[in-house]
Swiss-Prot record:
It comes from the Eukaryota. This is Phospholipase A(1) DAD1, chloroplastic. Its EC number is 3.1.1.32. The active site is at S295, D352, H418. Pfam families: Lipase_3 (PF01764). Gene3D superfamilies: alpha/beta hydrolase. Its main location: plastid. Residues 1-46 form a transit peptide.
């Protein structure tokens, strides 16, 4: 590791007629391609002297700037140089207490974990063949053994165990046979399952982690599935009378459910088979399942989390970390997720319109008790409105960011606000609601 320090020697002359002034010394350091700056306030000498004040030894500066359990040059929001071990509180960081006290200000450990899982989604995008003129369009560009390494995660400590495909359930008209083949691609590679194998990483995390990563919308039929925005009942789901007194029952967006359940060997089947195999192999040790995705992948991640907790009665802790996801289901579906213990952390950009669709939401979750904005209506009308196939509910805990807070985003447009790299940039820069963007953010957007 290369470390350089360049202290600025303070002046040693003191004017007797003026009150004592503290001397401020600026120390800049560079560690692992990360720049940081510390400010040390030193008491001024009581009398004028030809010798400069005694500065702390360089190793003292290094101890202030470096910490083996923190990103170099970064301090906790409380100002403490003593890091919090991730492994000791891993369930808390996975949402056991719904991330209470970790989001505002954003805990440094949680920030790093969000960014780390975001990189798994980035790798899913990198591995997908987007070229419609390619004979391998819609497939994974890399073999399973080298996918993580070739898609930007060479030292993740994870091993890819399963490739995942999603199939559209849309019935194509006959005339589609004359259209380009890419328009009729019904089944395409959408992500993967990977398991942590590195002993040091397992020790750092405090458990063995299974990650399921989903990319966002890519194919023509996936876009069409996104437009099927009406709510539909979950297959084999509980009745609404058992959940919140509603007759509608848990419902989710039709297109998302179609992509998850369609096909002779559906995405749902693949996820279930692989999770069953991994539970058989690692079920006797601390284990977590973290499902992450962007855009369409965020919605699919939520459905997969629900399905895993429903299918496996002794399922490990299941957490969703989603980026820029659309709405997925109704209030009854949200209640079902909460009841089964599924934890969902939604990273939302206030300027991203995708997070505001589909349908409408008739509630405000800023308070502990859900408050219906339509409370002026008679209760029976409210119930009827909620049971319509267009009324959705926000699911999980929300980390709300804004493109307008970043000094690196000169303009606000729909495409930029929804991009995954914008989300990761905003997560890296966010401090708190009172300090929305830090100057030391590492992820600067390059355009």
């Amino acid at each position: 590791m290369r470390f350089s320090l360049s202290p600025v020697r303070p002046h040693s002359v003191v004017v007797p007629s003026l009150p004592k002034q503290d001397v401020v010394s600026y120390i800049s350091g560079t560690t692992s391609n990360r720049q940081c700056r510390c400010v040390l306030t030193l008491p001024s000498p009581s009398v004028s002297t030809s010798r400069p004040p005694v500065l702390p030894k360089p190793e003292t500066w290094e101890s202030l700037l470096l910490n083996h359990d923190q990103i170099p040059g970064e301090f906790s929001p409380t100002g403490s140089s003593i890091p919090v071990k991730l492994g000791r509180r891993w369930m808390e960081y996975q949402g056991l207490q719904n991330w209470d006290g970790l989001l505002d200000p954003l805990d440094d450990n949680l920030r790093r974990e969000i960014l780390r899982y975001g990189q798994f989604v980035e790798s899913a995008y990198q591995a997908f063949d987007f070229d419609p003129s390619s004979p391998t369009y819609g497939t994974c560009r890399f073999p399973r053994s080298t996918l993580l390494e070739r898609s930007g995660l060479p030292n993740s400590g994870y091993r890819l165990t399963k490739n995942l495909r999603a199939t559209s359930g849309i019935n194509l008209p006959r005339w589609i046979e004359k259209a380009p083949s890419w328009m009729a691609t019904q089944s395409s590679w959408i992500g993967y399952v990977a398991v942590c194998q590195d002993k040091e990483e397992i020790s750092r995390l405090g458990r063995r982690d299974v990650v399921i990563s989903f990319r966002g919308t890519a194919t023509c039929l996936e876009w069409l599935e996104n437009l099927r925005a009406t709510l539909t009942h979950l297959p084999n789901g509980p009745t609404g009378a058992n959940l919140n007194g509603s007759n509608s029952g848990p419902m989710v967006e039709s297109g998302f459910l179609s992509l998850y359940t369609s096909g002779v060997h559906s995405l749902r089947d693949m996820v279930r088979e692989e999770i069953a195999r991994l539970l058989q192999s690692y079920g006797d040790e601390p284990l977590s399942v973290t499902i992450t995705g962007h855009s369409l992948g965020a919605a699919i991640a939520t459905l997969a989390a629900y399905d895993i907790k429903t299918t496996f009665k002794r399922a490990p802790m299941v957490t969703v970390i989603s980026f820029g996801g659309p709405r997925v289901g109704n209030r009854c579906f949200r209640k079902l997720l909460e009841k089964q213990g599924t934890k969902v952390l939604r990273i939302v950009n206030s300027d991203d319109v995708i997070t505001k669709v589909p349908g409408v939401v008739l509630e405000n979750r800023e308070q502990d008790n859900v408050k219906m904005t339509a409370s002026i209506m008679p209760s029976w009308i409210q119930r009827r409105v909620e049971e319509t196939p267009w009324v959705y509910a926000e699911i999980g805990k929300e980390l709300r960011l804004s493109s307008r807070d970043s000094p690196h985003l000169s303009s606000i447009n729909v495409a930029t606000c929804h991009e995954l790299k914008t989300y990761l940039h905003l997560v890296d820069g966010f401090v708190s609601s009172t300090c929305p963007f830090r100057e030391t953010a590492r992820r600067v957007l390059h355009r």
